Amino acid sequence: MPRNIVVEEIVRTPVEMQKVELVERKGVGHPDSIADGIAEAVSRALSKEYIKRYGIILHHNTDQVEVVGGRAYPRFGGGEVVKPIYILLSGRAVELVDQELFPVHEVAIRAAKDYLNNTIRHLDVENHVVIDSRIGQGSVDLVSVFNKAKENPIPLANDTSFGVGFAPLTETERLVLETERLLNSEKFKKELPAVGEDVKVMGLRKGDEIDLTIAAAIVDSEVSGPKEYLEVKDKIREAVEELASDVTSRKVNVYVNTADDPDSGIFYITVTGTSAEAGDDGSVGRGNRVNGLITPNRHMSLEAAAGKNPVSHVGKIYNLLAMFIANEIAETLPVEEVYVRILSQIGKPIDQPLIASIQIIPKQGHSVKEFEKDAYAIADNWLANITKIQKMILEGKVSVF
């Protein structure tokens, strides 16, 4: 059965050639990204435990995580957290399997703690955080689950929803993405341990000049005073300027912690490396899209991908799929930009979308008619192999934020 794939040429100014471009990335320690990361870690842990016990991923969605900011008194040399960060795990997961209880809350809380321990170095998970699992219950008859899986080897969409992807990234998009990845890389943390994980990067390109505004939480126990703090800021700026020279030939201005007022004793220092310690809250889906960026110059889906089940939830699968299709088209065909939008219809096989729309701005001197069939074939092949995205998610080979 042929798939509903439409390839068309569109006429618009590519983002790289527009006068103004805005790009944002919330780093892994930002409260919104903490919520995303925990939601995804919980979903992955539940999926693996379901497979281990029952041989199949049972229904769940853990895309409702709230991070409620705590209270801290940071000070140079080391402060303290006086009110812990509260993290609420919510959503739904099968807890009763053939009259046997499955330890949803135990698995979820352990996954959340492991994620925090592995992600935010200066966070004492046992003392700085309270994790509360209120994941709703569900029950299932395994025989009916297996029978349904046999009847429908391709999962049926559990929602009418769309996913969006685009490629290639502009220089500004790459720079914003790579800046946060640099500052939160293991190598950089070893060289400059004072830089916390809560790193937010905002990029503005105006013509051929790029402004990068970086908010980087500095860990108070790693700096002895204002002088050392300012030295850390200088090192951040220098590292990002060096990175920028490898990414673009445009002029790049780097600003770090612009709310600081040294004369008034105002510095962005934290005890834990995340602003969640001091009243900054976070929610799933309020931050980066599945490509790791927030891009108001582009089409975007508002779906919260993190924590959604990797089997049939198109809010997760179609956003990743659209990104993969766009990337392959951009890498193999003469396109300036490609936009992919995929729409499901609830109850229908996820490899048979209601529409897969591929909009292309071809490179100068080319027409989409030259490679329309190739673009169609790329999308068709990804849809035919859509279930491999589930495996990529479970193996942690793709990030959704």
UniProtKB/Swiss-Prot annotation:
Pathway(s) of this molecule: Amino-acid biosynthesis; S-adenosyl-L-methionine biosynthesis; S-adenosyl-L-methionine from L-methionine: step 1/1
Gene3D superfamilies: 3.30.300.10, S-adenosylmethionine synthetase, C-terminal domain
GO biological process, one term: one-carbon metabolic process
Described purpose of this protein according to its UniProt entry: Catalyzes the formation of S-adenosylmethionine from methionine and ATP.
Superkingdom in the source lineage: Archaea
EC number: 2.5.1.6
Source taxonomy: Archaea, Methanobacteriati, Methanobacteriota, Thermococci, Thermococcales
Disulfide bonds: none
Keyword Magnesium (UniProt): yes
The name this protein goes by in its record: S-adenosylmethionine synthase
Enzyme class: transferase
InterPro entries associated with the record: AdoMet_synthase_2_family (IPR027790), AdoMet_synthase_3 (IPR042544), S-AdoMet_synthetase_arc (IPR002795)
Required cofactor(s): Mg(2+)
Family, similarity comment: Belongs to the AdoMet synthase 2 family.
UniProt keywords, alphabetically: ATP-binding, Magnesium, Nucleotide-binding, One-carbon metabolism, Transferase
Catalytic activity: L-methionine + ATP + H2O = S-adenosyl-L-methionine + phosphate + diphosphate
Binding-site residues, ATP: G136, Q137, G138, S139, V140, D141
GO molecular function: ATP binding; magnesium ion binding; methionine adenosyltransferase activity
UniProt cross-references to Pfam families, sorted A to Z: AdoMet_Synthase
